[in-house]
């Protein structure tokens, strides 16, 4: 069984992440989405909320095959968690050349520490290349429409979260 390991903070999951996730299901029998937990990183959505978002998207994508998706957390080296779950390869999404430069460095380091784990790069679609979680949060915080950038359930959650912050 081929197991893809796709790690990130997913705060929130964007349509760019969704592009990559769709590619994962083409390449692997099972996809492990690993949400990195860092004590020094403040997130907008809790771990549980992010798990719910990703799980719902998985159900929407896969229907009865949603058992092909597993969502979990990690707070150690990505390669350690990937080994723990029996991953066949690591997945990294690319938006542009800047991402490629950074991800090539990471793939090199991971390859030295875990030569059995190959890194597979999946490019975002043209429509997903400009999307970042940071920009989505900024747009939502100012009351902007984020529906072109995130799944509808996440757009609603962002709207609700920032509406309460703004006191509306």
UniProtKB/Swiss-Prot annotation:
Keywords in alphabetical order: ATP-binding, Coenzyme A biosynthesis, Cytoplasm, Magnesium, Nucleotide-binding, Nucleotidyltransferase, Transferase
Main location (coarse class): cytoplasm
GO biological process per UniProt: coenzyme A biosynthetic process
Cofactor: Mg(2+)
Top-tier EC class: transferase
Pathway connected to this protein: Cofactor biosynthesis; coenzyme A biosynthesis; CoA from (R)-pantothenate: step 4/5
Function: Reversibly transfers an adenylyl group from ATP to 4'-phosphopantetheine, yielding dephospho-CoA (dPCoA) and pyrophosphate.
Record: residues binding ATP: 9-10, 17, 93-95, 103, 128-134
Assembly and binders: Homohexamer.
EC number: 2.7.7.3
Name by which UniProt lists this protein: Phosphopantetheine adenylyltransferase
Site (Transition state stabilizer): 17
Record GO terms (molecular function): ATP binding; pantetheine-phosphate adenylyltransferase activity
Organism: Bartonella tribocorum (strain CIP 105476 / IBS 506)
Keyword Transferase attached: yes
Binding site for substrate: 9, 41, 78, 92
